[in-house]
Amino acid sequence: MSFYSISDFIRENYPEYWGMQSYPANQCVRIHKIDEEWGIFSNFGHTPIVVEGVTFDTSERLFQLMKFKDEEPVKAIYYKKGNPKMTTKHWEKTHRREDWGEIIIDAMKFCLTQKYEQSEAFRQELERSKGKIIVEDQSGFTKKNPDAWGVKLQDDNFVGPNLLGRLLMELRDTGKLEYDLPDDAFTFLRYLK
């Protein structure tokens, strides 16, 4: 298993979200780029989130920071402009939470819930997507298969785990996501206040 792969985490800790899905492409709204239609669904979309008085420019930055408890990586990721995922990779091998695999989906559910509660535009777009399947389209990625969050187009279907799309549809259809995070899930915030 690659240190950065989350597939084993999902299979072991979140079996209800494990496995490949297939969706007819003509029934899907696709998350592809933040400046395209449905781009607000991307975790990289600029929908600021405030948690305990700390503002995050994107839900992706908040999610990436939840991987850490130590001051140095937290400050580096928070203050570095651009893609927080790339900055995070630098710190993960030496500083990632030991229990990250056990909380990864709950952390994403928290981030999406905050985005839902704090962004009217996000809620409106979720409502507008009713009746459609939401997918994170990774067809343009160079690797053969999509990662756990997305799908790739194969003939007339989007195929892949589609975790992000599935969580967004669950949030859209129920108005909430249930999550369970450890007491120390937000210790990183103390370095940002």
What are the functions of these language-model segments?
Residues S2-K193:
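Charged, low-complexity intrinsically disordered segments
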